[in-house]
């Protein structure tokens, strides 16, 4: 009788330990050889591409680009514009002049050169 009681206790403890083992199993990333990995692999690539910093090149498929045959997306520097208010103007007159800056550093605090995407078709450059 003692043997069956000990055996029952042992089996009960073993059953409890095994059931908690499966419920507490870590669910990490799937292994590369598994079927789950190939299904979620495409979604991971899409999510990673969305998280990249910066802009994407445009699709240069407009009417302008069809005439030359080969059209490609390129990055070109933009010309920043700064509006300066004349010190002689009063608050009632709001005249301002626009000055084009060719990548001058100004206060020597930055060397930022903004770039934008354009479509290049032969020797011509178009807005996308």
UniProtKB/Swiss-Prot annotation:
Keywords for this protein: Developmental protein, Disulfide bond, Secreted, Signal
Cysteines engaged in disulfide bonds, as pairs: 60-119, 65-71, 68-121
Any one GO CC term of the record: extracellular region
Biased segments, Polar residues type: 79-90
UniProt-listed GO biological process terms: guard cell differentiation; stomatal complex development
Signal peptide positions (record): 1-28
Subcellular location: Secreted
Pfam families: EPF
InterPro entries linked to this entry: EPFL
Region of interest (Disordered), residue spans: 79-100
Record's function text: Controls stomatal patterning.
PANTHER family: EPIDERMAL PATTERNING FACTOR-LIKE PROTEIN 2, EPIDERMAL PATTERNING FACTOR-LIKE PROTEIN 4
Similarity section: Belongs to the plant cysteine rich small secretory peptide family. Epidermal patterning factor subfamily.
Protein name: EPIDERMAL PATTERNING FACTOR-like protein 2
Species of the source: Arabidopsis thaliana
Highest classification ranks of the organism: Eukaryota, Viridiplantae, Streptophyta, Embryophyta, Tracheophyta
């Amino acid at each position: 009788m003692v043997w069956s009681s000990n055996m029952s206790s042992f089996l009960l403890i073993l059953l409890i330990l095994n059931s908690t083992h499966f419920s507490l199993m870590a669910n990490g990333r799937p292994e590369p050889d598994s079927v789950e990995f190939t299904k979620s692999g495409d979604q991971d690539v899409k999510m990673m591409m969305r998280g990249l910093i910066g802009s994407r090149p445009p699709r240069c498929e407009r009417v302008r680009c069809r005439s030359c045959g080969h059209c490609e997306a390129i990055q070109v520097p933009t010309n920043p514009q700064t509006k300066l208010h004349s010190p002689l103007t009063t608050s009632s007159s709001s005249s301002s002049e626009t000055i084009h800056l060719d990548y001058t550093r100004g206060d020597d605090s930055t060397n930022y050169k903004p770039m934008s995407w354009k479509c290049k078709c032969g020797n011509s450059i178009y807005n996308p």
